[in-house]
């Protein structure tokens, strides 16, 4: 499970690339670095692919998330599939097509869950999947 910088690092590990600075590299009307807002605040909406771990977790294709990043996925790494994106097309989630426990999100559920308990389900799902592999 990768979160924010881990999301970006995981993509690079699988051969993907990043936009180094969203404001300079990509035209967008959406705020991706919500530095002036409380960190738990929902900053923008995302769409979730129905055929994804994230959809299994949230049971919804629409979700609002916080946002604290100035880098973003440009080219997706090999063996990864996009599972969530913001309205401007920036990737917000992906998962591996080859490794069932490799998945990642760009937002910060670890900050949001105190205010939005459904965000805790990301961690519950990760623990459940990991625990099932321990013998």
Which residues fall in each region the model found?
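Amide-donor transfer/coupling interface in amidating biosynthetic enzymes
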Residues: 23-135
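Cysteine-nucleophile active-site neighborhood
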Residues: 1-37
């Amino acid at each position: 499970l990768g979160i924010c910088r881990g999301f970006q690092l995981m993509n690079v590990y699988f051969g993907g690339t990043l936009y180094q600075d969203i404001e300079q590299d990509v035209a967008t009307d959406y705020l991706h670095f919500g530095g002036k807002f409380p960190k738990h605040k929902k900053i923008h909406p995302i769409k979730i692919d129905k055929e994804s771990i994230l959809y299994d977790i949230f049971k919804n294709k629409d979700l609002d998330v916080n946002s604290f990043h100035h880098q973003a996925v440009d080219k997706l790494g090999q063996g990864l599939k996009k599972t969530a994106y913001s309205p401007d097309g920036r990737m917000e989630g992906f998962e591996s097509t080859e490794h069932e426990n490799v998945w990642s999100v760009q937002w910060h559920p670890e900050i949001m869950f105190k205010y939005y308990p459904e965000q805790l389900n990301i961690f519950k799902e990760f623990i459940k999947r990991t625990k099932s592999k321990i013998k």
